[in-house]
């Protein structure tokens, strides 16, 4: 079960705090995987806007992972993840290989994070740690009814 809580810091108004609490509701100890994900809406593939914003691994501090990005409209931003999780990067692109058998499809596609986490496909995420979609990869070993909290900014 997931309980999200969003708080506004005040200034600047775009500075958001997010607290996610996940609880193992099963009767047995369990491993929980949580993937807080950020992405840019794909407007470049459809000719609406050819500019493609980029995210990249940012400078991380003790106990924190960072994603940095520049956007023409939103400016320079950072996504901070408490606990220093690995951050997985891919593109917010449709997997045309899987859907249509297109051999020229993008190498890193929107379902790449799923393929990495669920199927262990290391080639599904960008090793250069850049893309238009990123997810913080948290894995917790929990006891029954044990809550785990993640804080993001």
Give the label of every model feature segment.
Residues 17, 22-110:
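Polysaccharide-binding surfaces and accessory modules of carbohydrate-active proteins
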């Amino acid at each position: 079960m997931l309980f999200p809580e969003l708080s506004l810091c005040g200034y600047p108004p775009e500075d958001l705090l997010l607290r996610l609490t996940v609880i193992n509701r099963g009767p047995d100890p369990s491993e929980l995987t949580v993937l807080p994900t950020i992405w840019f809406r794909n407007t470049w593939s459809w000719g609406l806007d050819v500019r493609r914003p980029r995210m990249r691994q940012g400078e991380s501090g003790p106990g924190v992972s960072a994603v940095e990005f520049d956007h023409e409209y939103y400016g320079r931003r950072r996504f901070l993840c408490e606990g220093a999780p690995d951050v997985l990067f891919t593109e917010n692109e449709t997997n045309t290989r899987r859907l249509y058998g297109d051999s020229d499809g993008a190498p890193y596609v929107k379902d790449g994070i799923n393929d990495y986490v669920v199927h262990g496909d290391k080639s599904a995420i960008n090793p250069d740690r850049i893309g238009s979609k990123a997810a913080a990869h948290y894995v917790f070993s929990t006891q029954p009814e044990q809550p785990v909290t993640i804080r993001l900014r």
